[in-house]
Amino acid sequence: MSGENNSSVTEFILAGLSEQPELQLPLFLLFLGIYVVTVVGNLGMTTLIWLSSHLHTPMYYFLSSLSFIDFCHSTVITPKMLVNFVTEKNIISYPECMTQLYFFLVFAIAECHMLAAMAYDRYMAICSPLLYSVIISNKACFSLILGVYIIGLVCASVHTGCMFRVQFCKFDLINHYFCDLLPLLKLSCSSIYVNKLLILCVGAFNILVPSLTILCSYIFIIASILHIRSTEGRSKAFSTCSSHMLAVVIFFGSAAFMYLQPSSISSMDQGKVSSVFYTIIVPMLNPLIYSLRNKDVHVSLKKMLQRRTLL
């Protein structure tokens, strides 16, 4: 491909998670199982919330949106990865690669800000319950959700637009299991200063701002929980908060490891492992974490199953 610019690039080869033939089938079965759980969990959560009228509140609208984002986020990446496990040459065309990159960025960035919106919603509900229904009205909730998607679309458009101006004239093997920004830029033979600057600035905004919002929200939430007199109530609240924080730490920690570390010490092999957490593991865990201790979700699911049994 030497000497050719990006207009003549027709395809790339994805290195995948592992090049060892004996691992391909076990990895295929593992990630197929994870994807099935992700699809059932997230689509099930979204369907349950929209079919249960008593779950039509801002908290559950946010949760429904997160489940939809997680489903889309995983679907952009996992099916192609599964196909690559069972094919000899993992080829992806240039248009497919750019499309995958764009939608991956849309949903990954949207998830960052959706998690922040959900943390703010819980902060208002726990720390300012009297003002909650005024500040987090249905209109405000839908505006926040719309804003989350707009940020995702705008940031993804900027990144992908800048990627179209990059000239690819090196070895066409992408050392990753999907088309991501940093692995693609490793193949460039033109200046990528603007792209790297964008990754640093936009990445800092999309990772650090939501992270700080979530951190501040949970500091105030924990402070409020400490004032709960009931030991049982305090223990239950801490248990719920800790499970939510675990999902947040895994998502933002792995994303920060991939995008915010200096490029001189960046390792694509380590990056592939960290990417698995925020692209595949977290979308599977979120519906389990956010619904496992939720009585309203349990009641709605029980009612829906009873209705289906009667029918």
UniProtKB/Swiss-Prot annotation:
GO molecular function list: G protein-coupled receptor activity; odorant binding; olfactory receptor activity
Membrane topology: Multi-pass membrane protein
Glycosylation sites: 5-6
Subcellular location: Cell membrane
Residues in compartment: Extracellular: 1-25, 76-99, 161-197, 259-271
Top-level taxon of the source organism: Eukaryota
The UniProt record lists the keyword Transmembrane helix: yes
Cytoplasmic-side positions: 47-54, 121-139, 218-237, 293-311
GO cellular component, one term: membrane
Disulfide bonds: 97-189
Major localisation: membrane
Keyword NAD in annotation: no
Keywords tagged on the record: Cell membrane, Disulfide bond, G-protein coupled receptor, Glycoprotein, Membrane, Olfaction, Receptor, Sensory transduction, Transducer, Transmembrane, Transmembrane helix
Gene Ontology process terms (BP): G protein-coupled receptor signaling pathway; sensory perception of smell
Pfam families xref list: 7tm_4 (PF13853)
InterPro entries: GPCR_Rhodpsn, GPCR_Rhodpsn_7TM, Olfact_rcpt
Function: Odorant receptor.
Protein family according to the UniProt entry: Belongs to the G-protein coupled receptor 1 family.
UniProt protein name: Olfactory receptor 8G1
Annotated source species: Homo sapiens (Human)
Name of the gene: OR8G1
